[in-house]
């Protein structure tokens, strides 16, 4: 495959698969590299890498003297076919330790929170807020931020509890046979003046 390379006056490089230089593509390394350490892997124009993160973003800030500081610590992102995706770990890792887990472009994690930051944890399944064993949004320092969701539907704490722990139906024993209140009402309605079967 023919490779087209663009290099600017600072030394930033971009690799393309087409002569018009519109489709970023490189098979043996990042298709975009900047002198400050930014690296993006592309396959046929889509962010994509199977053997590691597809995006390294330098962490930079301006210090109190107005000087731009660029750290080696980076925001790291995994992509597959242009979508944030990683199996077995977070798809995005921030320099401060915050993480987000994605599966084929959707926030998703089955064994813990899909979003972890300094203020809260959030549980997602297939892009929807969802947690069975507690609040789907959990405040780390402030429990008042806790929010309960099932399949992206907001519930109160009590509604969430009752959804997973429905009240048991009470039965009424008549002549050794147990009837729920609904069953007993149905029998009475069916009998309509006739004798009941017990």
Segments from the language model and where they lie:
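Glycine/tyrosine- and acidic-biased, solvent-exposed loop/turn segments at the edges of beta-strands
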Residues: 1-178, 183-198
């Amino acid at each position: 495959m023919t490779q087209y390379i663009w290099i600017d006056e600072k030394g930033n490089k971009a690799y393309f698969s087409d002569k018009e230089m519109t489709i970023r593509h490189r098979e043996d390394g990042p298709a975009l590299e900047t002198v400050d350490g930014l690296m993006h892997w592309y396959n046929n124009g889509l962010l994509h890498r199977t053997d590691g993160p597809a995006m390294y973003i330098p962490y930079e800030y301006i210090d109190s003297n107005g000087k731009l500081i660029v750290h080696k610590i980076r925001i790291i992102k995994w992509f597959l076919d242009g979508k944030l995706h990683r199996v077995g770990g977070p798809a995005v890792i921030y320099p401060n330790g915050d993480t987000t887990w994605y599966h084929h472009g959707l926030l998703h994690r089955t064994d813990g929170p899909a979003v972890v930051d300094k203020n809260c944890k959030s549980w997602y399944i297939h892009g929807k807020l969802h947690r069975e064993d507690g609040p789907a949004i959990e405040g780390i320092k402030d429990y008042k931020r806790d929010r309960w969701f099932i399949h992206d539907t907001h519930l109160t704490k009590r509604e969430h509890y009752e959804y997973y722990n429905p009240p048991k139906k009470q039965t009424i024993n008549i002549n050794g046979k147990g009837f729920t209140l609904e069953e007993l009402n149905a029998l009475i309605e069916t009998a309509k003046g006739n004798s009941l079967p017990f």
